[in-house]
Amino acid sequence: MMRARAKFAPLFLAGATLLFPPATALGAEQGFTPRLQTPRIAPLGKENRTPEQEAMLASRPDFNIYKTLAHDVDLYNRWSPLGRFILDGSSLPPREREIVMLRMGWLCQSEYEWAQHARIAKAQAGLSNQDIHRIAEGPAAAGWSDFERTLLRMVDELRYDTMISEATWNALRAKYSVQQVIEALYTAAQYQLVSMALNSLGVQLDPGLEDRLPKDGALPAPATQPKSPRLKQPRVPPLAESAWSEEQRKLIAEQKLTGPVLNLYRTMLNHPVLYGPRYKFGSYLQRDSLLPPKTRELLIMRTAALTGAEYEWGHHVEAAQKAGFSAEEIRRIKSGPDAPGWSEEHAAVLRAADELRREAFVSERTWTTLAKYYDTKRLIEIVYTSGGYTMTALAINSLGIQLEPGYPRFP
């Protein structure tokens, strides 16, 4: 049993002004929606599995998250290489990796993510129960090293401001290489996506998980519209073709077939090991998912608007036009689900993106409406598309990826 601690510190930087929304009192009107106590999508039982699902689950632990995601094997297979890299393949020290994961789980109020990674953090990364509780207290809590405070601050900035601040970037670079900063960024972004899925699909705790989200303090605040200006020049410059290694040329070959390589891909070439898993997942969401083109583009462009990712917006205007949206409808995406003119279906899709941004959870009202139009696989892909493009937005904003000339700006 974890002993009671002092109330959690609000999200302050020592000696600085308040950067993020203040902590929300338990039960406050504008706080978090209660999390689900039963699954929205039930884990697959052994008697109902296809050969493809059996193959997917054969190499995974008997956890509810995998048995739930087995409803969409194609999505899982395209996403899991990224997840494996972040969990097992990155160069981040295990303690620092788990601090990042747990902080994001706390900010998203994902009890499953918290319980699983508290277990991993204690067993594999040397964190104590006291350390884990302090993660919920945040960067202002006593006992952190300066760099651990920086990591916690990074997660807070990515959740609330959808980018890493200049001060935090410089503090990260004092210890980490550029590749390691990218890994830390993607670790936070991946576990925001994971939290969105766990919360919205109603994945319930596995037997034997002992840790729970702390209840003896204030909740974190839900996220709102980011306020900081976006970068006007790259922090990580796109890699010039003359500097590409043979490995990087092979990675980028598909993009070269369609013309000049975009800044997004040339920037991500700075981390060739991450490039492949990131592209495999992103290309599924962009081209191969089961979602209708209009649904996909609504999610992508609304997520771009909510995160202040103008690069993402600019590159999807043409795709939205091809999906059948008029210029007026594209402008209306930025106004959100309450703008007049949306169908019930499309308003619910936009509202899902808003709710995932706000509290990493699709509300019962929105889920019920979506379920009138989409089957189980497509419901999962709605969450993953919003979460996946949030991940891309955090990278775009934090790395300073600049929009190429000729692409539309935000209306």
Task: Tell where the protein language model's regions lie, with residue ranges.
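Universal eukaryotic N-terminal targeting presequences
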Residues: 1-3, 18, 25
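Bacterial N-terminal signal peptides that target proteins for export
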Residues: 1-12
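Bacterial N-terminal signal peptides
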Residues: 10-21
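Hydrophobic alpha-helical segments
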Residues: 26-411
